[in-house]
Amino acid sequence: MGRFTLKCLKCGREYGQEYRLTCDNDDSLLRADYFEKKLELRDQPGIGRFHSWLPVQEELTTEAGPITYKSEALAKELGLSNLYIGFSGYWPEREALIKTCSFKELEAHPTMQLLKESGGKAIVLASAGNTGRAFAYSSSLTGTDAYIVVPDSGVSSIWLPEEPANSIHLISMTPGNDYTDAINLAGRLAKLPGMVPEGGARNVARREGMGTVMLDAAVTIGKMPDHYFQAVGSGTGGMSAWEASLRLRDDGRFGSKLPKLQLAQNLPFVPMYNAWKAGRREIIPDIDMKDAKKQIEETYATVLTNRAPPYSITGGLYDALVDTDGIMYAITREEALEAKALFESLEGIDILEPSAVAAASLLKAVEAGNVEKDDVILLNIAGGGFKRLKEDFTLFQVEPEVTVSSSEVSLDELKI
Protein backbone atom coordinates (compact mmCIF):
# COMPACT_ATOMS: atom_id res chain seq x y z
CA MET A 1 0.00 0.00 0.00
CA GLY A 2 1.33 3.43 -0.92
CA ARG A 3 1.77 6.24 1.58
CA PHE A 4 2.29 9.25 -0.70
CA THR A 5 2.42 10.58 -4.23
CA LEU A 6 4.92 13.03 -5.70
CA LYS A 7 3.44 16.16 -7.24
CA CYS A 8 5.09 18.68 -9.55
CA LEU A 9 4.76 22.19 -8.13
CA LYS A 10 4.57 23.78 -11.59
CA CYS A 11 2.35 21.60 -13.78
CA GLY A 12 0.64 19.50 -11.11
CA ARG A 13 1.56 16.14 -12.64
CA GLU A 14 1.55 13.33 -10.08
CA TYR A 15 3.88 10.36 -9.79
CA GLY A 16 3.75 7.25 -7.65
CA GLN A 17 5.96 6.24 -4.77
CA GLU A 18 9.44 6.17 -6.29
CA TYR A 19 12.92 7.64 -6.10
CA ARG A 20 12.32 10.48 -8.55
CA LEU A 21 14.05 13.88 -8.66
CA THR A 22 12.39 15.66 -11.58
CA CYS A 23 9.12 16.11 -13.44
CA ASP A 24 9.07 14.94 -17.05
CA ASN A 25 7.44 18.23 -18.11
CA ASP A 26 9.55 20.95 -16.46
CA ASP A 27 12.33 21.73 -13.97
CA SER A 28 10.14 22.41 -10.93
CA LEU A 29 10.63 20.68 -7.61
CA LEU A 30 8.45 17.73 -6.71
CA ARG A 31 6.69 17.64 -3.34
CA ALA A 32 5.34 14.65 -1.44
CA ASP A 33 1.59 14.54 -0.88
CA TYR A 34 0.96 12.20 2.05
CA PHE A 35 -2.20 10.21 2.57
CA GLU A 36 -1.86 10.91 6.31
CA LYS A 37 -2.93 14.55 6.64
CA LYS A 38 -2.50 14.67 10.42
CA LEU A 39 0.83 14.07 12.11
CA GLU A 40 0.58 10.89 14.18
CA LEU A 41 3.75 10.24 16.17
CA ARG A 42 5.19 6.72 16.01
CA ASP A 43 6.88 4.90 18.88
CA GLN A 44 10.40 5.31 17.46
CA PRO A 45 13.44 6.95 19.06
CA GLY A 46 14.58 9.40 16.34
CA ILE A 47 13.13 10.80 13.13
CA GLY A 48 11.08 7.63 12.79
CA ARG A 49 8.62 9.36 15.16
CA PHE A 50 7.58 11.47 12.19
CA HIS A 51 6.88 8.55 9.84
CA SER A 52 3.53 10.16 8.88
CA TRP A 53 5.43 12.67 6.76
CA LEU A 54 8.52 10.78 5.63
CA PRO A 55 8.49 9.32 2.09
CA VAL A 56 9.43 5.76 3.06
CA GLN A 57 7.41 2.60 3.61
CA GLU A 58 9.22 1.13 6.61
CA GLU A 59 9.51 3.09 9.84
CA LEU A 60 13.03 4.31 10.50
CA THR A 61 14.51 2.97 13.74
CA THR A 62 17.60 5.20 13.94
CA GLU A 63 18.11 7.01 17.25
CA ALA A 64 19.19 10.10 15.30
CA GLY A 65 16.64 12.87 15.46
CA PRO A 66 16.27 16.56 16.29
CA ILE A 67 15.49 17.76 19.80
CA THR A 68 13.81 20.99 20.88
CA TYR A 69 14.23 22.69 24.24
CA LYS A 70 13.37 26.06 25.73
CA SER A 71 16.42 28.25 26.23
CA GLU A 72 16.98 29.92 29.57
CA ALA A 73 20.46 31.46 29.59
CA LEU A 74 20.67 32.73 25.99
CA ALA A 75 17.02 33.79 26.12
CA LYS A 76 17.68 35.84 29.26
CA GLU A 77 20.78 37.41 27.70
CA LEU A 78 18.74 38.50 24.67
CA GLY A 79 15.63 39.50 26.61
CA LEU A 80 13.44 36.86 24.93
CA SER A 81 10.73 34.95 26.78
CA ASN A 82 10.01 32.21 24.22
CA LEU A 83 13.29 31.21 22.60
CA TYR A 84 13.48 27.54 21.64
CA ILE A 85 16.58 25.77 20.39
CA GLY A 86 16.25 23.08 17.76
CA PHE A 87 19.44 21.07 18.24
CA SER A 88 20.75 18.46 15.80
CA GLY A 89 23.95 16.92 17.07
CA TYR A 90 25.43 14.92 19.90
CA TRP A 91 24.33 15.97 23.38
CA PRO A 92 23.31 12.81 25.25
CA GLU A 93 22.39 14.77 28.36
CA ARG A 94 19.51 16.19 26.31
CA GLU A 95 18.89 12.94 24.42
CA ALA A 96 20.41 14.34 21.21
CA LEU A 97 22.14 11.35 19.61
CA ILE A 98 23.20 12.37 16.10
CA LYS A 99 26.70 10.91 16.02
CA THR A 100 27.76 12.85 12.92
CA CYS A 101 26.88 16.06 14.79
CA SER A 102 24.83 17.57 11.95
CA PHE A 103 21.21 17.69 10.83
CA LYS A 104 22.45 16.39 7.49
CA GLU A 105 22.09 12.95 9.05
CA LEU A 106 18.34 13.60 9.15
CA GLU A 107 18.51 13.74 5.33
CA ALA A 108 20.67 10.66 4.91
CA HIS A 109 18.59 8.03 6.71
CA PRO A 110 15.29 8.54 4.82
CA THR A 111 17.16 8.96 1.52
CA MET A 112 19.04 5.67 1.92
CA GLN A 113 15.82 3.93 3.00
CA LEU A 114 13.93 5.25 -0.04
CA LEU A 115 16.83 4.20 -2.28
CA LYS A 116 16.66 0.69 -0.85
CA GLU A 117 12.87 0.50 -1.21
CA SER A 118 13.16 1.68 -4.82
CA GLY A 119 15.72 -0.99 -5.71
CA GLY A 120 18.73 1.34 -5.95
CA LYS A 121 22.16 -0.13 -5.23
CA ALA A 122 24.55 2.83 -5.12
CA ILE A 123 24.12 6.54 -4.44
CA VAL A 124 26.28 9.42 -5.72
CA LEU A 125 26.50 12.80 -4.02
CA ALA A 126 28.60 15.91 -3.68
CA SER A 127 29.29 17.50 -0.33
CA ALA A 128 31.10 20.44 1.21
CA GLY A 129 31.59 18.27 4.31
CA ASN A 130 28.65 17.63 6.63
CA THR A 131 26.37 15.92 4.09
CA GLY A 132 29.16 13.61 3.00
CA ARG A 133 29.84 12.58 6.60
CA ALA A 134 26.15 11.87 7.17
CA PHE A 135 25.80 9.73 4.06
CA ALA A 136 29.07 7.93 4.80
CA TYR A 137 27.71 6.98 8.22
CA SER A 138 24.39 5.85 6.77
CA SER A 139 26.33 3.82 4.18
CA SER A 140 28.27 2.18 7.01
CA LEU A 141 25.06 1.31 8.84
CA THR A 142 23.19 -0.03 5.80
CA GLY A 143 25.97 -1.43 3.62
CA THR A 144 24.65 0.56 0.64
CA ASP A 145 27.44 1.89 -1.57
CA ALA A 146 27.90 5.66 -1.41
CA TYR A 147 30.16 7.57 -3.80
CA ILE A 148 30.92 10.90 -2.16
CA VAL A 149 32.70 13.75 -3.98
CA VAL A 150 34.17 16.51 -1.81
CA PRO A 151 36.47 19.48 -2.44
CA ASP A 152 39.78 19.46 -0.58
CA SER A 153 38.35 21.80 2.08
CA GLY A 154 35.77 19.16 3.01
CA VAL A 155 37.97 16.06 3.31
CA SER A 156 38.75 16.57 7.01
CA SER A 157 35.00 16.67 7.72
CA ILE A 158 34.48 13.09 6.49
CA TRP A 159 35.02 11.21 9.75
CA LEU A 160 32.94 8.57 11.48
CA PRO A 161 32.40 7.43 15.08
CA GLU A 162 33.28 3.88 14.00
CA GLU A 163 35.56 2.08 11.52
CA PRO A 164 34.54 3.09 7.97
CA ALA A 165 32.91 0.34 5.93
CA ASN A 166 34.02 -0.75 2.46
CA SER A 167 30.75 0.62 1.07
CA ILE A 168 32.07 4.20 1.42
CA HIS A 169 33.87 5.53 -1.65
CA LEU A 170 35.34 8.99 -1.03
CA ILE A 171 36.57 11.01 -4.01
CA SER A 172 38.43 14.20 -3.17
CA MET A 173 39.29 17.15 -5.41
CA THR A 174 42.51 19.15 -5.29
CA PRO A 175 42.70 22.69 -3.84
CA GLY A 176 41.14 25.27 -6.15
CA ASN A 177 38.02 23.16 -6.64
CA ASP A 178 34.94 24.06 -4.59
CA TYR A 179 31.58 22.52 -3.70
CA THR A 180 30.08 23.40 -7.08
CA ASP A 181 32.95 21.61 -8.85
CA ALA A 182 32.17 18.58 -6.67
CA ILE A 183 28.51 18.83 -7.71
CA ASN A 184 29.52 18.86 -11.38
CA LEU A 185 31.74 15.79 -11.02
CA ALA A 186 29.09 13.93 -9.02
CA GLY A 187 26.58 14.74 -11.76
CA ARG A 188 28.79 13.02 -14.32
CA LEU A 189 29.37 10.03 -12.03
CA ALA A 190 25.65 9.62 -11.45
CA LYS A 191 25.13 8.91 -15.15
CA LEU A 192 27.19 5.71 -14.95
CA PRO A 193 25.22 2.43 -15.00
CA GLY A 194 23.89 1.42 -11.58
CA MET A 195 24.44 4.84 -10.01
CA VAL A 196 21.60 6.90 -8.51
CA PRO A 197 22.09 10.65 -7.94
CA GLU A 198 21.31 11.81 -4.41
CA GLY A 199 19.71 14.90 -5.94
CA GLY A 200 20.31 17.69 -3.44
CA ALA A 201 17.28 19.93 -2.99
CA ARG A 202 15.38 17.90 -5.60
CA ASN A 203 15.49 14.89 -3.30
CA VAL A 204 12.14 14.83 -1.48
CA ALA A 205 13.40 12.40 1.19
CA ARG A 206 16.25 14.77 1.98
CA ARG A 207 13.95 17.78 2.42
CA GLU A 208 11.48 15.80 4.55
CA GLY A 209 14.27 14.58 6.81
CA MET A 210 15.42 18.13 7.47
CA GLY A 211 11.83 19.22 7.91
CA THR A 212 11.58 17.11 11.06
CA VAL A 213 13.34 19.95 12.90
CA MET A 214 10.20 22.05 12.41
CA LEU A 215 7.92 19.09 13.19
CA ASP A 216 9.74 18.38 16.44
CA ALA A 217 9.55 22.04 17.44
CA ALA A 218 5.81 22.27 16.75
CA VAL A 219 5.11 19.10 18.72
CA THR A 220 7.31 20.26 21.63
CA ILE A 221 6.01 23.83 21.76
CA GLY A 222 2.41 22.94 20.90
CA LYS A 223 2.31 25.33 17.93
CA MET A 224 4.43 26.51 15.06
CA PRO A 225 6.99 29.16 16.05
CA ASP A 226 6.55 32.75 14.91
CA HIS A 227 10.13 32.90 13.59
CA TYR A 228 12.61 30.34 12.28
CA PHE A 229 16.36 31.09 12.23
CA GLN A 230 18.90 29.09 10.25
CA ALA A 231 22.10 29.55 8.26
CA VAL A 232 21.84 28.50 4.60
CA GLY A 233 24.23 27.58 1.81
CA SER A 234 21.94 25.85 -0.66
CA GLY A 235 18.78 26.98 1.11
CA THR A 236 17.37 23.46 1.33
CA GLY A 237 16.98 23.63 5.10
CA GLY A 238 14.88 26.78 4.86
CA MET A 239 12.76 25.23 2.13
CA SER A 240 12.29 22.12 4.27
CA ALA A 241 11.14 24.16 7.26
CA TRP A 242 8.63 25.97 5.03
CA GLU A 243 7.24 22.75 3.55
CA ALA A 244 6.91 21.19 7.00
CA SER A 245 5.07 24.33 8.14
CA LEU A 246 2.61 24.05 5.25
CA ARG A 247 1.73 20.52 6.39
CA LEU A 248 1.44 21.60 10.01
CA ARG A 249 -0.93 24.39 8.96
CA ASP A 250 -3.06 21.92 7.03
CA ASP A 251 -3.05 19.56 10.03
CA GLY A 252 -4.97 22.26 11.90
CA ARG A 253 -3.60 21.66 15.40
CA PHE A 254 -0.46 23.81 15.28
CA GLY A 255 -1.69 27.23 14.20
CA SER A 256 -2.45 28.87 10.87
CA LYS A 257 0.36 31.42 10.55
CA LEU A 258 3.53 30.21 8.86
CA PRO A 259 6.80 30.90 10.69
CA LYS A 260 8.76 33.82 9.24
CA LEU A 261 11.98 32.45 7.74
CA GLN A 262 14.96 34.46 9.00
CA LEU A 263 17.94 33.00 7.17
CA ALA A 264 21.61 33.88 7.08
CA GLN A 265 24.54 33.60 4.72
CA ASN A 266 28.20 34.05 5.62
CA LEU A 267 30.13 36.97 4.16
CA PRO A 268 31.81 37.44 1.78
CA PHE A 269 29.89 34.71 -0.16
CA VAL A 270 26.22 35.73 0.04
CA PRO A 271 24.54 35.31 -3.40
CA MET A 272 21.05 34.53 -2.09
CA TYR A 273 21.20 37.41 0.39
CA ASN A 274 22.20 39.78 -2.42
CA ALA A 275 19.46 38.59 -4.78
CA TRP A 276 16.79 38.71 -2.05
CA LYS A 277 17.88 42.17 -0.90
CA ALA A 278 17.60 43.36 -4.51
CA GLY A 279 14.11 41.87 -4.77
CA ARG A 280 15.14 39.46 -7.52
CA ARG A 281 14.07 35.89 -8.13
CA GLU A 282 17.21 35.32 -10.21
CA ILE A 283 20.77 35.20 -8.94
CA ILE A 284 23.04 37.20 -11.25
CA PRO A 285 26.56 35.77 -10.82
CA ASP A 286 28.41 38.93 -11.94
CA ILE A 287 26.54 40.95 -9.32
CA ASP A 288 25.66 38.53 -6.52
CA MET A 289 28.85 36.46 -6.36
CA LYS A 290 31.56 38.27 -8.23
CA ASP A 291 34.87 36.41 -7.91
CA ALA A 292 33.01 33.56 -6.24
CA LYS A 293 35.92 31.16 -5.76
CA LYS A 294 37.97 33.80 -3.94
CA GLN A 295 34.95 34.68 -1.77
CA ILE A 296 34.42 31.00 -0.93
CA GLU A 297 38.05 30.62 0.17
CA GLU A 298 37.56 33.57 2.55
CA THR A 299 34.29 32.26 4.05
CA TYR A 300 34.36 31.07 7.68
CA ALA A 301 31.59 28.47 7.29
CA THR A 302 32.71 26.91 4.01
CA VAL A 303 29.83 24.40 4.03
CA LEU A 304 27.51 27.37 3.38
CA THR A 305 28.92 27.94 -0.11
CA ASN A 306 27.02 26.79 -3.18
CA ARG A 307 27.39 28.64 -6.49
CA ALA A 308 24.22 27.07 -7.88
CA PRO A 309 21.67 27.08 -5.03
CA PRO A 310 18.00 26.13 -5.61
CA TYR A 311 16.91 29.71 -5.01
CA SER A 312 15.03 30.59 -8.22
CA ILE A 313 13.40 27.23 -9.00
CA THR A 314 9.64 26.78 -8.51
CA GLY A 315 9.27 25.69 -4.88
CA GLY A 316 12.76 26.93 -4.06
CA LEU A 317 14.06 29.33 -1.44
CA TYR A 318 12.76 32.48 -3.14
CA ASP A 319 9.21 31.11 -3.02
CA ALA A 320 9.69 30.10 0.62
CA LEU A 321 10.88 33.59 1.58
CA VAL A 322 8.01 35.26 -0.29
CA ASP A 323 5.39 32.98 1.28
CA THR A 324 6.67 33.59 4.82
CA ASP A 325 7.57 37.29 4.42
CA GLY A 326 11.13 36.22 5.16
CA ILE A 327 14.31 38.10 5.97
CA MET A 328 17.91 37.34 5.03
CA TYR A 329 21.09 38.36 6.84
CA ALA A 330 24.74 38.62 5.84
CA ILE A 331 26.98 37.60 8.74
CA THR A 332 30.70 38.38 9.08
CA ARG A 333 33.29 35.95 10.41
CA GLU A 334 33.68 38.10 13.51
CA GLU A 335 29.93 38.15 14.18
CA ALA A 336 29.78 34.37 13.83
CA LEU A 337 32.72 33.81 16.18
CA GLU A 338 31.25 36.16 18.79
CA ALA A 339 27.87 34.41 18.60
CA LYS A 340 29.53 31.00 18.83
CA ALA A 341 31.39 31.97 22.00
CA LEU A 342 28.23 33.47 23.51
CA PHE A 343 26.04 30.46 22.69
CA GLU A 344 28.57 27.91 23.94
CA SER A 345 29.19 29.74 27.21
CA LEU A 346 25.48 30.20 27.95
CA GLU A 347 23.93 26.97 26.61
CA GLY A 348 26.79 24.64 27.50
CA ILE A 349 27.41 22.80 24.22
CA ASP A 350 29.82 23.38 21.34
CA ILE A 351 28.35 24.22 17.93
CA LEU A 352 29.58 23.95 14.33
CA GLU A 353 30.35 26.93 12.09
CA PRO A 354 26.98 27.14 10.28
CA SER A 355 25.19 27.16 13.62
CA ALA A 356 27.41 30.02 14.74
CA VAL A 357 26.22 31.96 11.68
CA ALA A 358 22.60 31.15 12.59
CA ALA A 359 23.12 32.28 16.18
CA ALA A 360 24.66 35.52 14.91
CA SER A 361 21.58 36.17 12.77
CA LEU A 362 19.38 35.90 15.86
CA LEU A 363 21.55 38.46 17.68
CA LYS A 364 21.26 40.74 14.66
CA ALA A 365 17.48 40.30 14.50
CA VAL A 366 17.09 41.21 18.17
CA GLU A 367 19.27 44.29 17.69
CA ALA A 368 17.30 45.34 14.58
CA GLY A 369 13.91 44.82 16.24
CA ASN A 370 12.93 42.05 13.82
CA VAL A 371 11.53 39.97 16.68
CA GLU A 372 9.39 40.93 19.67
CA LYS A 373 10.25 39.95 23.25
CA ASP A 374 7.37 37.48 23.58
CA ASP A 375 7.48 36.01 20.06
CA VAL A 376 7.95 32.26 19.85
CA ILE A 377 11.33 31.81 18.17
CA LEU A 378 13.01 28.64 16.89
CA LEU A 379 16.78 28.83 16.44
CA ASN A 380 17.95 25.87 14.38
CA ILE A 381 21.34 24.82 15.70
CA ALA A 382 21.89 22.46 12.79
CA GLY A 383 25.16 21.01 14.03
CA GLY A 384 26.91 20.68 17.36
CA GLY A 385 28.34 18.47 20.06
CA PHE A 386 31.55 17.58 18.21
CA LYS A 387 33.71 18.15 21.29
CA ARG A 388 31.16 16.27 23.40
CA LEU A 389 31.21 13.35 20.94
CA LYS A 390 34.99 13.02 21.22
CA GLU A 391 34.60 12.38 24.95
CA ASP A 392 32.58 9.22 24.19
CA PHE A 393 33.87 7.97 20.83
CA THR A 394 37.08 7.44 18.90
CA LEU A 395 36.73 9.11 15.52
CA PHE A 396 38.01 7.56 12.29
CA GLN A 397 38.96 9.61 9.25
CA VAL A 398 37.61 8.33 5.93
CA GLU A 399 40.49 8.29 3.44
CA PRO A 400 39.87 9.22 -0.22
CA GLU A 401 40.08 6.35 -2.69
CA VAL A 402 41.21 8.78 -5.36
CA THR A 403 41.97 12.51 -5.71
CA VAL A 404 41.19 14.33 -8.95
CA SER A 405 42.18 17.76 -10.25
CA SER A 406 39.01 18.78 -12.09
CA SER A 407 35.33 18.04 -12.55
CA GLU A 408 36.17 17.27 -16.20
CA VAL A 409 38.56 14.43 -15.32
CA SER A 410 38.22 11.21 -17.31
CA LEU A 411 35.91 8.91 -15.36
CA ASP A 412 38.27 6.04 -16.18
CA GLU A 413 40.71 7.60 -13.68
CA LEU A 414 38.22 6.94 -10.89
CA LYS A 415 38.40 3.16 -11.46
CA ILE A 416 34.79 2.60 -10.50
UniProtKB/Swiss-Prot annotation:
Q: Name one GO molecular function term.
A: magnesium ion binding
N6-(pyridoxal phosphate)lysine modification sites? Answer: K104
Q: Which reaction does it catalyse?
A: O-phospho-L-serine + sulfite + H(+) = L-cysteate + phosphate
Annotated residues that bind pyridoxal 5'-phosphate are located at N130
Q: Which SUPFAM superfamilies match?
A: Tryptophan synthase beta subunit-like PLP-dependent enzymes (SSF53686)
Keyword Transferase included in the entry's annotation: yes
Question: EC number(s)?
Answer: 2.5.1.76
Q: In which pathway does it act?
A: Cofactor biosynthesis; coenzyme M biosynthesis
GO terms for biological process?
coenzyme M biosynthetic process; D-serine biosynthetic process
HAMAP family in UniProt: Cya_synthase
Q: How does it assemble?
A: Homotrimer.
Can you tell me which family this protein belongs to? Answer: Belongs to the threonine synthase family. Cysteate synthase subfamily.
Role of this protein? Specifically catalyzes the beta-elimination of phosphate from L-phosphoserine and the beta-addition of sulfite to the dehydroalanine intermediate to produce L-cysteate.
Indicate what this protein is called per its UniProt record: Cysteate synthase
